[in-house]
């Protein structure tokens, strides 16, 4: 009798597949503030969040409110930052994209005013303000794609910290194990053709091959629904 394949185990949501959110620090987003006022705040600390690749900055407003945002390069504990339309466009300050000069590097950009930040939050990334038209600001994302967001959407000046993360080699499998363990992802990722027949529909045989068409129907039952699911076509394009 066959065993449950990994997608079936993931659907059951055992602890291996659950995010350990009890060790996460806090959501990283801008607080809801009066958009007409400019606030001063202090960076109290830079903290590590096991659920992220990016360090978080613990920021305390002059009103006493504490929140967390992804830290930018050059940010330090004790730094005074400004938040609002009257803030200067310098590293670490948060202000509406409509107030940021063209050509500046920005991160953690709001898709809609007040959502806390949706774009450009990964380590070492930044976007560039490229232009404005009709109440919207054009921003070039790290992928090269240009998007438009309302002028009232907020962003932070700078480059997300942790950009050298991928430069350090893991060197051994144990390091990769602990790396992905903190993110609650299954590692290592084993190919189906490398498994025994009892553990995957593509497993078994004297050499690694699928042994049957890898395309399956949309309504295929769990345990068999692997490979190219409801594929219109597979293989190399011809002509």
From Swiss-Prot:
What segments bear the compositional bias annotation Basic residues? 225-239
Primary role: One of the primary rRNA binding proteins. Required for association of the 30S and 50S subunits to form the 70S ribosome, for tRNA binding and peptide bond formation. It has been suggested to have peptidyltransferase activity; this is somewhat controversial. Makes several contacts with the 16S rRNA in the 70S ribosome.
Gene that specifies this protein? rpl2
Q: Kindly give the InterPro entries that the UniProt entry links to this protein.
A: NA-bd_OB-fold, Rib_uL2_dom2, Ribosomal_uL2, Ribosomal_uL2_arc_euk, Ribosomal_uL2_C, Ribosomal_uL2_dom3, Ribosomal_uL2_RNA-bd_dom, Translation_prot_SH3-like_sf
Instruction: State the similarity comment.
Output: Belongs to the universal ribosomal protein uL2 family.
Q: Pfam families, per this entry?
A: Ribosomal_L2, Ribosomal_L2_C
What segment(s) does the record annotate as region Disordered? Answer: 202-239
Q: Which UniProt keywords apply?
A: Ribonucleoprotein, Ribosomal protein, RNA-binding, rRNA-binding
Descriptive protein name: Large ribosomal subunit protein uL2
Coiled-coil segments, which residues? none
Is Cytoplasm among this UniProt entry's keywords? Answer: no
What domain of life does the UniProt record list for this protein's source?
Answer: Archaea
Under Gene Ontology molecular function, one entry of this record is: structural constituent of ribosome
**GO terms (BP aspect):** cytoplasmic translation
- Which species is listed as the source? Desulfurococcus amylolyticus (strain DSM 18924 / JCM 16383 / VKM B-2413 / 1221n) (Desulfurococcus kamchatkensis)
Q: How does this chain assemble?
A: Part of the 50S ribosomal subunit. Forms a bridge to the 30S subunit in the 70S ribosome.
Q: Any one cellular component term from GO for this entry?
A: cytosolic large ribosomal subunit
């Amino acid at each position: 009798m066959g065993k449950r394949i990994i997608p079936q185990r993931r659907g059951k949501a055992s602890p291996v597949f659950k995010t350990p959110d009890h060790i996460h620090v806090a959501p990283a987003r801008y607080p809801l503030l009066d958009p007409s006022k400019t606030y001063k705040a202090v960076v109290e600390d830079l903290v590590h969040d096991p659920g992220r690749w990016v360090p978080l900055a613990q920021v305390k407003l002059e009103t006493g409110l504490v929140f967390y945002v992804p830290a930018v390069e050059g940010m330090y504990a004790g730094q005074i930052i400004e938040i609002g339309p009257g803030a200067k466009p310098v590293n670490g300050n948060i202000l509406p994209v409509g107030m940021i000069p063209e050509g500046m590097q920005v991160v953690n950009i709001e898709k809609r005013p007040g959502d806390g930040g949706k774009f450009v939050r990964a380590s070492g990334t930044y976007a560039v303000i490229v232009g404005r038209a009709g109440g919207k600001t054009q921003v070039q994302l790290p992928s090269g794609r240009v998007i438009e967001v309302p002028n009232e959407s907020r962003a932070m000046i700078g480059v997300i910290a942790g950009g050298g993360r991928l430069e350090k080699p893991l060197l051994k499998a144990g390091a990769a194990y602990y790396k992905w363990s903190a993110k609650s992802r299954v590692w290592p990722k084993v190919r189906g053709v490398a498994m025994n027949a009892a553990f995957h529909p593509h497993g078994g045989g004297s050499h690694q091959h699928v042994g049957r068409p890898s395309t399956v129907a949309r309504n295929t039952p769990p345990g068999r629904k692997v490979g190219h699911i409801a594929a219109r076509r597979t293989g190399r394009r011809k002509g």
